[in-house]
Amino acid sequence: MFDLKSKCALLTISDLSNFQSYDNLIVKPLIGLGWECEFIPWDSTSVNWDDFDAVIIRSTWDYQQKEKLFFKTLQSIEASSATLYNSLDIVKWNINKRYLLELERENISIIPTRLYDSFDFEIVSDLFSFFNENKLVIKPCVSANADDTFILEQSKMENLKSVLEGTFSRKDFLVQPFIKNVESEGEYSLIYFGNRLSHVLLKTPKDGDFRVQEEHGGILKTINKPESSLIDFGNKVMGTIPYQCLYSRVDVVRGSDNYLLMEVELIEPSLYFNMDPKSPQMFAEVFNKWHG
């Protein structure tokens, strides 16, 4: 009698050499639960998605460069017999950072945010006085890995004018005040499988930088005993997301008197399986239960 295993595709990119990915750590636990796993570049054109029972979006870290093709791939998966995690509806909701304003309306504290669909140098320059800050952050509404993210200083704006116009002339973008605690303390990531908190880490930028991603020199530290107020904030955010998600990452920074939501990552976040030895098994078990 043949042992028919379930098959799972883990979506990635064809070249991870410039990235830090730890998704290989979930393969052994998944195999132990009866799954066959295969890493597949998301833009591969020769895949029959009906060959798989489940497809999990993982390290698809160039999708923002080919957004239409990315959606076409996900639509093909959802039209097949395979189940997509997280679902296409979740991706559509989460891919544009306009969702932050939706969460703010649900009483989630976010970094003050202004959204624009066209670039006007004078309007952006006026935001220094609007926010009463001398540093701002500007980034696309659809972005990943801190791509096309800039720190703006009022005294240096004129030097960046042509770069900003070239970068944002054809894309939606947001502007926020720069939160100093990103440099001094760092950014917290709370990682959930289902609605269960798995682990918490603190990501700090290298000296002279503001980006906390490892690819930019960021340093990771596991927080074994996170403050109860941080957990409460993360749980509150999770309770306002209008979908049930297999995996979620809530990125948070400490404000002057409370925590502020930076982003909710529901598409292809690094889940930092390397930072908690129990997390790969926990992920596999939650996934197996969800799919069962």
Residue spans of the language-model regions?
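Active-site nucleotide/adenylate-binding loops and adjacent lid/helix of ATP-dependent enzymes
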Residues: 2, 6-12, 74-79, 88-185, ...
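Anionic group-transfer/hydrolysis microenvironments
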Residues: 60, 114, 141, 178-179, ...
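Glycine-rich phosphate/pyrophosphate-binding beta-alpha loops
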Residues: 61, 146, 206-207, 265-275
